[in-house]
C-alpha cells in the first residue's frame, strides 16, 4: 500500500501530510472520483495517530492523541465505514473523573441526567447548561465544526455561541459546589489557555456534549487504528499513498490541479511561500502558537491506585483538584512559568483494552501544559500530582518515556513548540485561523489550500479541518458542490 518514491504521473489533487485532517481531505476528494495522492514524510501514516512500544516490549503507548470523543461525533468520520476496516472503539463506563484531596471524585458519564444528579446541589444548573446544547447539536454540529459563516440555524447557533464565547470562569459561576466548578474547569482547560479568557468555554462545552452523545472512547489496539482504518478506506477507493517523502517545496510534487497541505502556517511559508502574496505571508507570520505540553508514558506493574474508586472506571482522569488550582496552573503557564502543581490530563487505556500491555501489566499516558518551546523536565511535578491522588503510584512504575516540547515538534512538525492545537485558540484565532479570509482554507495562491488544525475548527481528532478544506477545493477547482 505504501511506497517511498514519488511517481511522475499527474494527479487531480495532492494532499501533503497524513494526520487525521490530511486523511480526511484525501478521502473527501477521492470519494468524488478524483485521482488523489497522499504524501507523508514519515515511514508510517497517521500524524498524531500513532501507537508505539515506547517503554518496554509489549507495552503499547499512544504517542500523541489517546482518547477520542471528537472522532465519534465528527460529522465526517461518523459517515465512514471504518469498522469494516478494523476500527473498534471501547467506551469506558466513565468518560472522565476528577479526583479531590478528600478521596472523592466528580465524574462525567454518558448520561447527562446521571452526571447532573451526581453533582447534587448543582443538578439543575448542569442541566440548564447542557440540555439546550444536546437538543440543538444535530442542528449545529456542522456549524460549530466549520469556519465562520451565516448559520443555517441561527437561533440554535446563537444559543450555543453565547455560552461558547464566554470565559470558563464566567461559566463556572453557574455552579455553587466546589465539585461542579472543578469538573467544569478540567473540561475547559483543554482549551490550553487561561480560563479567564473569552472562548475558553467552547472546548469544554463541546467535550461534555460529546460525552453525553457518545462517550469518550479509545480505539482497541491504539490510536494508530484510526489512521490505519482511514488509510485503508482511502486506498480501497483508489487513492494512492507515498511515505518517506519530506516535502520542502511545491516543486518536488507531481503536477496537480489542487494541493492541500496538512501543515502549520510556519511550514506553509517554507513549502509554498514563493507562491503566496505579501499580505497573506504577513498574516501567516503573525499567527500565534499556544502553550506546549510535556508528556509521559508509563509501563506499570499494576493499575494506578486512585483513592477515589470512580477513577478506576474512567478512561480519562483530570488531575487538578479545584477550580482555583486549575486557574492558577494555566495562568502561570501562560505567563511563562512552570507550575509546582500542574493540571495533568491522564489516560489509562489498559484498564479497558487488554491489547495495550502484557497480561497483568498496565500503561498510563499523561501530559501537562508548559510554556511554548519549554524543555524543562516536568516528570517529578506530574508524578507528584498523580501520587497525590493515588498513593503508591510511583512504586508501580516499571519504565517511563518522556517527551518535551522540542521532542514533540521533532516527532511531528505540526506541534510547533509543543502546541497540540495547531495554534492558540483565542478569540481572534477561533474561526479565522490561520488568517482573516472569506475562506480560511484557501491560501492566496490558486489551487493551494491549508487543511491542518491551524484552520477551523482547530485541534482534535475529528478530520473536519481536512473535510472543510477539501469541500472548498472541490467547489473552487472541480465545480463539485458538497452540501454536508
Q: Locations of the language-model features?
A:
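N-terminal glycine-rich phosphate/pyrophosphate-binding loop and immediately adjacent elements
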Residues: 5-135
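Mid-domain catalytic core of redox enzymes
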Residues: 243-357
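Conserved FAD/dinucleotide-binding core of flavoprotein oxidoreductases
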Residues: 114-117, 266-270, 299-301, 358-388
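Extreme N-terminal leader/targeting segments of oxidoreductases
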Residues: 1-13, 31-32, 429-432, 436, ...
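Rossmann-like flavin
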Residues: 101-198
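Helical element adjacent to the flavin cofactor pocket in flavoenzyme catalytic cores
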Residues: 207-248
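A glycine-rich dinucleotide-binding beta-alpha-beta segment and adjacent secondary-structure elements
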Residues: 181-194, 341-345, 392-456
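A conserved FAD-binding loop/helix module that cradles the flavin
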Residues: 451-474
